[in-house]
Amino acid sequence: LQTYTADTITLDAAGEDFIIKDESSFWYGKSLHGLYRQAYTPWEWHQPIMDRAKNQGMACFSSPFDEDSVDFLEELNMPAYKIASFENNHLPLIKKVAATGKPMIISTGMATISELYEAVSMARESGCESLALLKCTSSYPASPENSNILTIPHMRELFGCEVGLSDHTMGIGAAIAAVANGASIIEKHFTLS
């Protein structure tokens, strides 16, 4: 799950910086606020989704995008949290999640090593004892060549934690290569159509 509202993730503005410019996007020419308003998971759906997952023997957790989302998710007894790539430098959010004492997964898309050091340090200093990083190439779809799978062992060595892959490629080859290089978590992005 992803937990946010359009108002907590962007401004309801029509300026050039708030319009989607990617001509290949289904959302081309539309506002970011409109996209997030239409794409968000309604908060009242979270509990039924979590219950359904539990009944199927799966753990369900969420990516909060702001501190209020963490408060809401804590009311649902969220078992773990994922920090999305766009939020991996949002240190107050990382601090708030870490303070829950729950496991945290941080996606690393677009972050520099220095930014990741800050995020990992904040998580650990704020109480996170179970931390994992996901190697992530923030493009959809990502090409296997640009997925930089060989950095997985290096990340494990640098940060002393579990490392996995947030896989945006077509097919399963990148995930297999990631596991062969020591990945312990695979997050696979896919569509059913």
Roles of regions detected by a PLM:
Residues 1-193:
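Catalytic cores and adjacent flexible loops of soluble metabolic enzymes
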